[in-house]
C-alpha cells in the first residue's frame, strides 16, 4: 500500500486507493502541511477524523524512508508536500421505492507525502 521514492534531501511516501473521498482526506492533509513531523504525529494521534490513522501511517513511512534510505535527521524533518488525488470510484446500487434504484458512488483517494530536512538558522 505504501510506496517509496527518494532523492537528495527529501523522502516521499504514498498511500493509494484509500477508502475515503478526496475532500475529506484533503482536510487532514492541509492541516499537517508545512508542519514539523513530530508535531504532526501528535496532532494526527489525537485527531477525531477517522482517516487520520492512515495519514499517520503514511507519514511514518516517509520518515522511515528519510532515516533509513537517506540518513536524514528525523528531528529536523518538515512536511513540505501533502497532496491528495482522486482514485477509482466503486459504483453501487441502492433499491428504492416502486421498483426504482439509485446509484451510490464510493470514492477512493491517493495520498502523497514529502518530508524535507530543514537547516537550522
UniProtKB/Swiss-Prot annotation:
InterPro entries in alphabetical order: Ribosomal_uL22 (IPR001063), Ribosomal_uL22_bac/chlpt-type (IPR005727), Ribosomal_uL22_bac/org-type (IPR047867), Ribosomal_uL22_CS (IPR018260), Ribosomal_uL22_sf (IPR036394)
Keyword Transit peptide: no
GO cellular component: cytosolic large ribosomal subunit
Segment forming the signal sequence: none
GO MF annotation, one: structural constituent of ribosome
SUPFAM superfamilies: Ribosomal protein L22
Entry-linked CDD domains: Ribosomal_L22
RNA-binding among keywords: yes
UniProtKB keywords: Ribonucleoprotein, Ribosomal protein, RNA-binding, rRNA-binding
Pfam family, one: Ribosomal_L22
GO biological process: translation
Subunit structure: Part of the 50S ribosomal subunit.
Family named by the database record: Belongs to the universal ribosomal protein uL22 family.
Purpose of the protein: This protein binds specifically to 23S rRNA; its binding is stimulated by other ribosomal proteins, e.g. L4, L17, and L20. It is important during the early stages of 50S assembly. It makes multiple contacts with different domains of the 23S rRNA in the assembled 50S subunit and ribosome. The globular domain of the protein is located near the polypeptide exit tunnel on the outside of the subunit, while an extended beta-hairpin is found that lines the wall of the exit tunnel in the center of the 70S ribosome.
Protein name: Large ribosomal subunit protein uL22
